[in-house]
Amino acid sequence: MLEPFFKNYFNQSLTKYNSQVDAINNFGPMLSNLSDDEIRQRVQILKQQLLSNKNEADIICEVFAIVREATFRTLDIKHFDVQLIGGLVLNDGQIAEMKTGEGKTIVALLPTFLNALYGKGVHVVTVNDYLARRDAETVGRVHRFLGLTVGLIQEDMSPEERKQNYQCDVVYVTNNELGFDYLRDNMAFTQEEVVQRPLFYCVVDEVDSILIDEARTPLIISGPSEAPTQKYLQTSQLARVLQKNIHYIIDEKNQVVKLTDEGTLFCEQALKIADLYSPSDPWISYVLNSIKAKELFIRNTHYIVNVEEEVIIVDEFTGRTMAGRRWSDGLHQAIESKENLPIQDESQTLASITYQNLFLLYDKLSGMTGTAKTEELEFEKIYGLKVIPIPTHRDVKRKDFPDLVYKNQYLKWQAIANECIKMNEIDRPVLIGTTTIEKSELLAALLSEYNVPYRLLNARPENIESEAEIVSQAGCRGAITISTNMAGRGTDIALGGNLESLLKVKLKKFISDLVSADFSTVLKSAQFDEFLVSFVPVFETFGLSKLNESSVREDLLEYLNEGIIPDRSDITDFITAYNSFLKERAAILLEEKTLITKLGGLHVIGTERHESRRIDNQLRGRSGRQGDPGSSRFFLSLDDKLLRLFGGDQILNLLQNIGLEDDAPIQSPILTKSLESAQKKVEVYYFDSRKQLFEYDQALTMQRNGIYSERKRVLEKESLRDWIIEYGERSLYDITLAFSTNTNLALDKFFALKTQELLGMPYQVKWESAKGDINVLLNNLKHQFQVSYTLKEAQLEAIEPGIMRELERSFLLQQIDFSWKEHLQKISALRDSIRWRSYGQRDPLTDYKKESYSTFVTMLNRIRHQVIYFIFRSKITIDFE
């Protein structure tokens, strides 16, 4: 009964956009009659109106219509009405749930262009460098056509390049680069080192992957800290002889390891220590990490070991490697020891932030994905984002067949191989999604035994390089593609194959044979291979995406204008030959698409249910795009992780009661409901985990925002003298407060000691001169301090003019950074210990907030004291050589 209600609710939520879509369409005929320059002039007029405080609602329809027309002129693509609705939803700061193949990339053009007109910079966030570069080069042409600048942030860019690109109107960037640039900016020592502008508006592609899946892992910038290598080596050897369920217990659901009493005693005897938990020499964390490394972290599942003998984490949601990321709290070192690799130093956190708090810094946030509805509650509770499903342009024709469950892994993989063989015999394309590298290679080996051709895509470097090409051609006739998790792959699978990708592959194939030759001669050649070779540098330079005559002509002429190719006379021959090839290949692909459509389209095979229904839905969603036919089926085993942890025994009893043959699968509505129930339990568990992380991090977030705001003002302020004077006076106030509340020392001795300790110089005070009034005493101290500071300033300025301002800034930044680093360590230790408070009938979160705030206030006081102390103690040495 509820389903019709929700369906009507969301239909009503979209109804409000219908009038805007009609208005956008009404601008179409007028805009189509304008020249390119006239459209750009219209953009400038609208921009001025927006900057003159004209209501955005008054111009949004015309702006969207302009983007639609520009997209058609540059990419030969025209937005559908449902795509316009998607753009309006994004502009309202919501999440647009759009199925795979519905054109999310061009939908993002609409709100990004409108918000870029404010001149504050707009970010389009993607999950990897390849997608960021692809979008900047392809759809970025629309923004450039309309007069905007387009920036791109890549992993290997220098700070100067990053700053230049962040100044652009629209910036394409990955979530990783965005977060680390934010942290680095807040560690900068000069304003010139800061690369980002204030965070204004952001569209997050694959928003569920970034804001949900990666929310538990904070971004951390760390510095080296010496690792106790011997402890890791000893406990790694110890873990090898410890026995499960005797010495330790594994809670696989919660990823927790617990030592038994027998295990604790055994470890203490083996390590020849009195107490594993000794505060002065603790061993327990090393033992537990070594057991976790042995039992819970599996090579080629959770990580790989590369040729440089480094442990590289594999993202469980995307199947991609996470270069540069390390597990914290000694776990990474424990895995290195387990693999007999060099143990890297432990790291000390210098700065950190979660994606939850990073993206909440934007004035306006929106996102898009094919699968967000299952996490709707979390998006609304934590980010304040509503999920709005956008109707598909064409009805989804994919058939999702019931799951097949087998008694063991052997029977399951045999059935999957047989399914692949059956599909291959009729030339129907198949996409198989696996959960780990190990399992993808197991299936590959099995298909090799049957002489069935396949393409393999997993986190191994040699496979990643061909990722886009492998995925784009997964819809070719007879193609069998084995892939680890498909989340965030970002490339549509077109039935019959992708023409653009085919051309790219052909061009790259010939680039190695490219030799110096007269371009005019090559253009006249009838040999198409030579023609392709000659086109490689042009293609590589401009990253052509829409390969038609107009775009080729435009980019070639621009290339020629640079004087690289002196003779333009044969351009027409070149374009004619090129378009001839396009038409020929397009006709062949159309024939193949027709054939594959008759066969039923792309068939998707899932080899295991993921803990999240979203990931399963993402895999299914690769089939049946844009009204194409397709199908999906999951093949499961009772010893799959999800079934094993959540009800495998019950299902096994069901199988036995039914009395099926050993190799016969089971499929039933009861089974499907059990699986969905198991997934919901896991999703609730992880949601609670992320919610708890968010609640705890809120206290630190307020502190981080405060310290970063202060730091930013330090960089921007021309003179910090007034601040330093205020710091000194606050320090003196702290001293007088301490004296008035608690001291047994004589007044003069107390102040001499405290001012020496905190300010680096003893102040002389007499209680009689203050007439017994603490405020009079404080004013006397302030006067002494100001005189002392002025004298110190004069002394240093006489040696080197301007040095005092530099010292103030330098000492202040150094103390903020050093104190913040120590504060993060203390907060981390507090969070580790606070969990035990619940056993004492106390609320750990309340205690954490109180104690973290107290620690923060202490840190601020320490910064003030230390800055003054170092300034007064500073000396300048003059080198006369």
UniProtKB/Swiss-Prot annotation:
SUPFAM superfamilies: Helical scaffold and wing domains of SecA (SSF81886), P-loop containing nucleoside triphosphate hydrolases (SSF52540), Pre-protein crosslinking domain of SecA (SSF81767). PROSITE patterns: SECA, SECA_MOTOR_DEAD. The keyword Thylakoid applies. It catalyses: ATP + H2O + cellular proteinSide 1 = ADP + phosphate + cellular proteinSide 2. One of its GO terms (molecular function) is protein-exporting ATPase activity. Keywords: ATP-binding, Chloroplast, Membrane, Nucleotide-binding, Plastid, Protein transport, Thylakoid, Translocase, Translocation, Transport. It is a peripheral membrane protein. It holds the Pfam family SecA_PP_bind. It is an enzyme of class 7 (translocase). InterPro entries: Helicase_ATP-bd (IPR014001), P-loop_NTPase (IPR027417), SecA (IPR000185), SecA_CS (IPR020937), SecA_DEAD (IPR011115), SecA_motor_DEAD (IPR014018), SecA_preprotein_X-link_dom (IPR011130), SecA_SF2_C (IPR044722). ATP binds at Q83, G101, E102, G103, K104, T105, D492. One of its GO terms (biological process) is protein targeting. It is found in: Plastid, Chloroplast stroma; Plastid, Chloroplast thylakoid membrane. GO terms for cellular component: chloroplast stroma; chloroplast thylakoid membrane. Its EC number is 7.4.2.8. The keyword Phosphoprotein does not apply. Has a central role in coupling the hydrolysis of ATP to the transfer of proteins across the thylakoid membrane. PANTHER family: CHLOROPLAST PROTEIN-TRANSPORTING ATPASE (PTHR30612:SF0), SECA INNER MEMBRANE COMPONENT OF SEC PROTEIN SECRETION SYSTEM (PTHR30612). Belongs to the SecA family. This is Protein translocase subunit SecA. It comes from Emiliania huxleyi (Coccolithophore). The gene is secA.
